[in-house]
């Protein structure tokens, strides 16, 4: 089967009150359009055509790697006119599935069923299949009109509906599937004689009836699948639905969430057994949590892998890190891109790392900056230690070998190497390589000035 998918993404989105095109607004960390394209990809189509118009160049430049064929709708003359723009690129014998970029939560299983409906009833594949839904509040949506036999013969848009039609609960989702040849016959016949002065795609239903093309419908199992986004309130509502579904899926697979309503996933999260996630945690990109991991409250993890038995304490921020088994991080720690921890490492409160590679058992427990540094096994980094890695132009590396003990308030001026089992005295500024197994310090004599008095403030006249 040749399957061609058309995604309508040309709308202006006036009710968003934004300079950003509506389809670029994010839900669960991704643009709305990306959600729909990723769902479409799971159907293995021959092509995905995205119809763009308002803010089109911004859309294309923001999503340059989408595997789609971009089709420009120069004038936004309605949904029917938008679909018509793609038809020259689609062979007559292909099936065409029409989706909307602002309906992001539609499920691939639903679309597969709709495609099957479009093939089921007639051997010449001329059926028009519509995705419909029953909504308690159908306001703003096109209503399905059926005859006495229950057959669909029309769809009436909200702005063209009388009070009787507005009372109908069954709505058209904007999603349909039929043979391309049907659309090529019907679309040029559309009229813009309606309240909006637009060429509605929904008018193809009346044309299908006139041509005696069978119309079938599939009712969406979940109302959220057909919910569109026209304003920021609706965006927030679907965000919470998406997050709740993601939370439920994680809990079904064995993770514990302290509060599913205070959990945010903005990418992919893979959890081992007996993972615990406290409140207000944000997971972005691809995050992997090994067996028995615990994530404290108010943490942010972006593109992070944690091994088994790791614990991240409250208010810690991790980005682009790979953490091995049984490590402890935080509270209030910041691990930046390029940080790698071997097993049994500890990063304590108010420690920042960047491009820092820790071997087994190494600890930095308090108040340190460790950037562009290689640390061996069982190193102890004292409070207030800083690797001074930037000379104003270039970054330089610090190497700290196995078993080193670094006293508090030490500055390591890179490039510099500290030999194995060396000890650095507290308050030292290390500018040259340190030999192994020795104590190195930069001594400044302590001096007492006897009889010195503090200045006394004088009262002003």
From Swiss-Prot:
Q: Which GO terms describe its molecular function?
A: glucosamine-1-phosphate N-acetyltransferase activity; magnesium ion binding; UDP-N-acetylglucosamine diphosphorylase activity
Q: Repeat as a keyword?
A: yes
Catalyzed reaction equations = alpha-D-glucosamine 1-phosphate + acetyl-CoA = N-acetyl-alpha-D-glucosamine 1-phosphate + CoA + H(+); N-acetyl-alpha-D-glucosamine 1-phosphate + UTP + H(+) = UDP-N-acetyl-alpha-D-glucosamine + diphosphate
Q: Where is this region: Linker?
A: 233-253
The record's similarity note reads:
In the N-terminal section; belongs to the N-acetylglucosamine-1-phosphate uridyltransferase family. In the C-terminal section; belongs to the transferase hexapeptide repeat family.
Enzyme class (EC, first level)? transferase
Compartmental location: Cytoplasm
Q: What does this protein do?
A: Catalyzes the last two sequential reactions in the de novo biosynthetic pathway for UDP-N-acetylglucosamine (UDP-GlcNAc). The C-terminal domain catalyzes the transfer of acetyl group from acetyl coenzyme A to glucosamine-1-phosphate (GlcN-1-P) to produce N-acetylglucosamine-1-phosphate (GlcNAc-1-P), which is converted into UDP-GlcNAc by the transfer of uridine 5-monophosphate (from uridine 5-triphosphate), a reaction catalyzed by the N-terminal domain.
**Broad class of where this protein is predominantly found:** cytoplasm
Pathways involved:
Nucleotide-sugar biosynthesis; UDP-N-acetyl-alpha-D-glucosamine biosynthesis; N-acetyl-alpha-D-glucosamine 1-phosphate from alpha-D-glucosamine 6-phosphate (route II): step 2/2; Nucleotide-sugar biosynthesis; UDP-N-acetyl-alpha-D-glucosamine biosynthesis; UDP-N-acetyl-alpha-D-glucosamine from N-acetyl-alpha-D-glucosamine 1-phosphate: step 1/1; Bacterial outer membrane biogenesis; LPS lipid A biosynthesis
Swiss-Prot/TrEMBL GO biological process terms: cell morphogenesis; cell wall organization; lipid A biosynthetic process; peptidoglycan biosynthetic process; regulation of cell shape; UDP-N-acetylglucosamine biosynthetic process
Name of the protein described by the UniProt record: Bifunctional protein GlmU
List the source organism. Legionella pneumophila subsp. pneumophila (strain Philadelphia 1 / ATCC 33152 / DSM 7513)
Q: Which residues bind UDP-N-acetyl-alpha-D-glucosamine?
A: 8-11, 22, 73, 78-79, 142, 157, 230, 336, 354, 369, 380
| Entry cofactors | Mg(2+)
Entry binding sites for Mg(2+): 102, 230
User: What are the start and end residues of every segment in region (Pyrophosphorylase)?
Assistant: 1-232
- Mind giving the lineage of the organism this protein is from? Bacteria, Pseudomonadati, Pseudomonadota, Gammaproteobacteria, Legionellales
- Please name one Pfam family that this protein belongs to: Hexapep
What cellular-component terms does GO give this entry? Answer: cytoplasm; membrane
Query: Region labeled N-acetyltransferase — which residues?
Result: 254-461
Cofactor: how bound: Binds 1 Mg(2+) ion per subunit.
Residue positions binding acetyl-CoA: 383, 389-390, 408, 426
State the active site: 366
């Amino acid at each position: 089967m040749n399957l061609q998918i058309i995604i309508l993404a040309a709308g202006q989105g006036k009710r968003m009150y934004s300079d950003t095109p509506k389809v670029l607004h994010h839900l669960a960390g991704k643009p709305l359009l990306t959600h729909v394209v990723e769902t479409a990809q799971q159907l293995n189509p021959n092509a995905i055509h995205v119809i763009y118009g308002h803010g089109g160049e911004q859309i294309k430049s923001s999503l340059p790697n989408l595997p789609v064929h971009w089709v420009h709708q120069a004038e936004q003359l309605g949904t029917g006119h938008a679909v018509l723009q793609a038809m020259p690129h689609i062979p007559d014998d292909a099936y065409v599935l029409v989706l909307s970029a602002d309906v992001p939560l539609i499920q691939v299983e639903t679309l597969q069923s709709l495609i099957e409906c479009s093939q089921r009833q007639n051997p010449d594949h001329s059926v028009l299949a519509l995705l419909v839904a029953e909504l308690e509040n159908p306001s703003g949506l096109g209503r399905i009109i059926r005859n006495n036999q229950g057959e669909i013969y029309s769809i009436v848009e909200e702005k063209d509906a009388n009070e009787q039609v507005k009372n109908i609960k069954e709505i058209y989702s904007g999603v349909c599937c039929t043979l391309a040849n049907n659309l090529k016959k019907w679309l040029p016949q559309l009229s813009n004689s309606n309240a909006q002065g637009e060429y509605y795609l929904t008018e193809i239903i009346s044309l299908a009836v006139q041509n005696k093309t069978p119309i079938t419908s599939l009712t969406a199992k979940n109302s959220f699948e057909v919910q569109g986004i026209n304003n920021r309130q609706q965006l927030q509502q679907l965000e919470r639905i998406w997050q709740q579904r993601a939370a439920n899926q994680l809990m079904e697979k064995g993770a514990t969430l302290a509060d599913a309503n205070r959990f945010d996933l903005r990418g992919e999260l893979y959890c081992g057994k007996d993972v615990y996630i406290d409140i207000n945690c944000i997971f972005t990109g691809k995050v992997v949590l090994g067996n028995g991991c615990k994530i404290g409250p108010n943490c942010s993890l972006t593109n992070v892998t944690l091994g088994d038995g790791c614990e991240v304490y409250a208010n810690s921020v991790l980005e682009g890190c790979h953490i091995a088994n049984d490590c402890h991080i935080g509270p209030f720690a910041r691990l930046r891109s390029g940080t790698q921890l071997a097993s049994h490492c500890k990063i304590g409160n108010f420690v920042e790392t960047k491009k820092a590679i820790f071997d087994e058992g190494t600890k930095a427990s308090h108040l340190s900056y460790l950037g562009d540094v290689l640390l061996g096994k069982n190193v102890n980094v004292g409070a207030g230690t800083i690797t001074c890695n930037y000379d104003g132009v270039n970054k330089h590396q610090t190497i700290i070998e196995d078993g080193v003990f670094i006293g508090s308030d030490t500055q390591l001026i890179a490039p510099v190497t500290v030999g194995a089992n060396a000890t650095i005295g507290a308050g030292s500024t290390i500018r040259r390589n340190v030999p192994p197994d020795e104590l190195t310090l930069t001594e400044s004599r302590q001096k007492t000035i006897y009889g010195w008095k503090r200045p006394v403030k004088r009262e002003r006249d």
